[in-house]
Amino acid sequence: MEALGFLKLEVNGPMVTVALSVALLALLKWYSTSAFSRLEKLGLRHPKPSPFIGNLMFFRQGFWESQMELRKLYGPLCGYYLGRRMFIVISEPDMIKQVLVENFSNFTNRMASGLEFKSVADSVLFLRDKRWEEVRGALMSAFSPEKLNEMTPLISQACDLLLAHLKRYAESGDAFDIQRCYRNYTTDVVASVAFGTPVDSQQAPEDPFVKHCKRFFEFCIPRPILVLLLSFPSIMVPLARILPNKNRDELNGFFNKLIRNVIALRDQQAAEERRRDFLQMVLDARHSASPVGVQDFDMVGDVFSSTRCKPNPSRQHQAGPMARPLTVDEIVGQAFIFLIAGYEIVTNTLSFATYLLATNPDCQEKLLREVDLFKEKHMVPEFCSLEEGLPYLDMVIAETLRMYPPAFRFTREAAQDCEVLGQRIPAGAVLEMAVGALHHDPEHWPSPETFNPERFTAEAQQQHRPFTYLPFGAGPRSCLGVRLGLLEVKLTLLHVLHKFQFQACPETQVPLQLESKSALGPKNGVYIKIVSR
């Protein structure tokens, strides 16, 4: 009996601890790899994942380089794991068409991590299902040619500050980082056009708006926290949402308060006194339901059509009242997306275009002649004259976006199990469109690393295979602000090249090193010299 008692104590003590530890380790080992059989079951090739973090280390060199490597090693349809989440990567045009257009009803939503800032989560970029459709429909009118024409003078005013700053570099003859100048300029445009708050980032870097913008784009998740989020998403993501975060809360509070104050001021003003900026266009549209259906949401298709500055007859219907008007949080969200697109996408597009023109002087000379002729006819450019009167500038921008698409990857989620061109797609799967790999595929773009604006003559574009050029996406959920983004890029290059010429110099990095943590951009800036004309 004493022996049995002794045995009982042993079982209840250290042996239980050891047994539980072994069971826990076995459970963790199973959990660490349990999500990593799904791609294989779908017949999709992929890099070998590491326990818990999946293929996170595959992307340590940057998403751009890794996207090219995925395409090279595993083909136009492959996959990877980021933590436990599975991604199906597509760079095959016909399948992309099926996802973005033909089967859009099953791929309506973008992937959301659950960690987005409140302002970002309430934007049209991340809204989902019916609410996305309602808000996108209401905002369509804010991007009409008529409304963009009203915003053109505001962009030109911000550009005047940029020109004054560039003049000092032209007078000094020094090499400088023009990307930093563009970043200050796009901050000024965003503040003025989207937030109704004119600033001068170059002269007033301590302005609260400028400081909070800088804080937002410097925000990043520490690597150990990122590993935990990827490894245990069902626990860590909800926890991260509810735990206090001073930086996040201060940024949300600042931009929310700023918009609320502007709304309160404008509600007290007569209609003719209100500033005609993007924020006002959103406020004007906040109660209006879309007069069109999802099938007419494709802004990118309109922009690249031959009638891009003419009214679309399908949209010439009177909008009715919106069942649930845009909330203040949603209005802040739209301004916030303007901030992200303006600060990153427009800045980087301008930087890349400047680099390509500086290193391709023959193309720059041709563009300068077009700019001079245009300026002779249009001293004060309007939206439609910019749309139709600068064909070579259009070609330069299009080729810049082919070579260096800032938005080089975007996602869709499968709502239900389906089959796309013979490939089974399970519900909840995240599909990633590999725009960078598509734009550098020699099958579609011969000599893809060569800058050649002639790829985008009217005749050449007729020969392009559909869905091989996607700098703004495609289909009903393509970029809503494509017109405004291109307007800002074109207007800026027009004003700058009318006054200055870009020159490569010993400090110019050739080829450019790239950074791709989020949007694609130059890693070390774009150093050039400029000469007054």
From Swiss-Prot:
It holds the Pfam family p450. The keyword Cytoplasm does not apply. Heme binds at C479. One of its GO terms (molecular function) is oxidoreductase activity, acting on paired donors, with incorporation or reduction of molecular oxygen. One of its GO terms (biological process) is prostaglandin biosynthetic process. Keywords: Endoplasmic reticulum, Fatty acid biosynthesis, Fatty acid metabolism, Heme, Iron, Isomerase, Lipid biosynthesis, Lipid metabolism, Lyase, Membrane, Metal-binding, Monooxygenase, Oxidoreductase, Prostaglandin biosynthesis, Prostaglandin metabolism, Transmembrane, Transmembrane helix. InterPro entries: Cyt_P450 (IPR001128), Cyt_P450_CS (IPR017972), Cyt_P450_E_grp-I (IPR002401), Cyt_P450_sf (IPR036396), Cytochrome_P450_3A (IPR050705). Its cofactor is heme. It comes from the Eukaryota. Monomer. This is Thromboxane-A synthase. It comes from Macaca fascicularis. The gene is TBXAS1.
